[in-house]
Amino acid sequence: MESLALRSISLSASYLSLHRSSSKSFALLPPSISVHTSPTLRSLSISSPRFTLRATASSLPEEQNKPQPPPPSPPQPQGAKLIPLAISVSIGLIVRFLIPRPEQVTSQGWQLLSIFLFTISGLVLGPLPVGAWAFIGLTASIVTKTLPFSTAFAAFTNELIWLIAISFFFARGFIKTGLGDRIATYFVKWLGKSTLGLSYGLAFCETLMGLIMPSTMARAGGVFLPVIKSLAISAGSYPGDPSSRKLGSFLIQTQLQCSGASGAILLTSAAQNLLCLKLAREVGVVISNPWITWFKVASVPAFVSLLCTPLIIYKLYPPELKHTPEAPAAAAKKLERLGPITKNEWIMLGAMAFTVSLWVFGEAIGIASVVSAMIGLSTLLLLGVINWDDCLSDKSAWDSLTWFAVLIGMAGQLTNLGVVAWMSDCVAKLLQSLSLTWPASFIILQACYLLIHYLFASQTGHAGALYPPFLAMQIAAGVPGVLAALCLAFNNNLSGALAHYSGGPAALYYGAGYVDLRDMFRVGFVMALVQAIIWGGVGSFWWKFLGLY
């Protein structure tokens, strides 16, 4: 009993001592202790056992009263992840040394194929960041003397990759000036009651813009990526962060997967469409009244695809933020707070309108798309809307430029060295040996054309290398010429969302940092199957109705 009384007196004395020197004592309290005040009582909320020792053992030396530092965290592993590294290297070595080289393929071509597969597997498994691993693949191609230095780096002069980089800088301008936030707020005001409605609005808006902007790359980089980033950030969804799944990653995936259908619906919606038409004419397939014919054949399956794709991704890759019934009213109030458009927003809007005009009419006056983008960026730099430090600090732009150039260069050399032609010959011989009907040959060749795109980093390059031989094989198998020519062209558009390197928009959207690499491959493959079912199922009935077969 005496012991209990003494302990109570000690605790009371300690409390009074603390109460008299509260300012000094609270300055020494560890962060885990919070002080709550009521009108009649000041109490201590204790969540750390060290406070009890400090309150009752005030006679201990001052060093012992100091809060102890947290234990050091274990060091992060340095360098490449060993298991993904070992798997990637093993794939390259197995192809190079254990699988017999076909007679039709040169030693240089086979060695490049092994390095390409080594690079692609590393991009999927992720032993290092994407740009770093692509650079290692590039180095391997030079060290092994598979490619000379000038050839390995030749793709860094490719117009497409610089158009991608400049599009990132445009997106930076939209965000810096606040124009992207303003446009995004209007989208929320009109369509923002649900995330799904927002994705439908963006998808159909891109389809309509295909009438005036004949480049999926230009639409993605100049318009929709800045808007999506502004929408995501305004919702608290940030790249490279767990919050990316809140909104940004869903909108990125939806817009990328819808870009295939929006690029296929019109002859002028994508740059490679006109190339396919030209190549079909060289093979002997002439399409009369091409603009109208193209739209009639593509319209129904493309429209069904645009209706289904956002909903399927909503189930497959759902956003955390789904319903926002209060968002339109909040967006209207935000627009009032933003006030009138600022000077820099007008400059940004004017520069982009001028750039888009050059994208639309530039070909007629001899100005390429990348040159139009360079003129627009130069205008923004000269007028100070963005500065060079803004461009230098955009890591996504330079990272995308690096790895995409590496893959474009390797894929182009696979074509030049005969590897792609060998694959086409293998498919042709397989079909001949099976003696299939023309519908079966049509399905197999379309599937092969789609899947072989994993070896290409450019839809235009894919069409230039494989469109003529695959069209010729289908015609030889008895497939109606117009049906084969148009379906291969539609297929060429849909293949652009297979992976992060499948085309300019894919590289751009992946570079925004909202989607993990594995999710890019997973969603890309699943949606490729979905698109094949939609276009093959709905399309076959529609094309029969049109009399294509």
Swiss-Prot record:
InterPro entries: CitT-rel (IPR030676), SLC13A/DASS (IPR001898). May be involved in the transport of dicarboxylate compounds. It comes from the Eukaryota. Pfam families: Na_sulph_symp. This is Dicarboxylate transporter 2.2, chloroplastic. Its main location: plastid. NCBIfam families: dass. The keyword Plastid applies. The keyword Phosphoprotein does not apply. GO terms for cellular component: chloroplast inner membrane; plastid. GO terms for molecular function: malate transmembrane transporter activity. Residues 1-54 form a transit peptide. Residues 57-79 are annotated as: Disordered. It is found in: Plastid, Chloroplast inner membrane. It comes from Arabidopsis thaliana (Mouse-ear cress). Keywords: Chloroplast, Membrane, Plastid, Plastid inner membrane, Transit peptide, Transmembrane, Transmembrane helix, Transport. Belongs to the SLC13A/DASS transporter (TC 2.A.47) family. DIT1 subfamily.
